[in-house]
Amino acid sequence: MESEVAMKSDKKERGQSVLLFAILMPLMSLFLLGILDYMVTNARVMETVAVADLSAHAGAQEITVLPDGTINVTARGNQVAALYFNAQRPSYTQLVSVSCGRVQNRPACLVQAQTRSAGYLLSARWVTVRAIGYLANGVTRGDQ
């Protein structure tokens, strides 16, 4: 008698594990795609930050500061920053603007760039990155 009770199966619970698998599998796939999208986009943003930072510091080295504190800005700083950016940039980034001169009352170069998100789960979009390279004492091209 006990064995008959233990062996009886309830017909109401038939296919429960299949239904659970059918519901959870697409949700897990979406979750994993979301994580992959975030990771690839984050790596792209970090690479764009590195390229923008390098080009901002290269452009800042073209700024000259006179002994009286006057900042001499030429178009050469913008050109050098753009040249460095375009030489190093990955295919999914683009240069938006370069502005070398006085930034926050200090000699610096501001580079603004954009990178495309991965677009695996969400639609691809542009992520804006800004980098400032300040001129440090003794780091102009003439001092090297």
Which positions does each model-derived feature cover?
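Short, conserved structural patches
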Residues: 3, 46, 65-144
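Alpha-helical assembly-interface signal, strongest on the long, hydrophobic N-terminal helix that forms
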Residues: 2-78
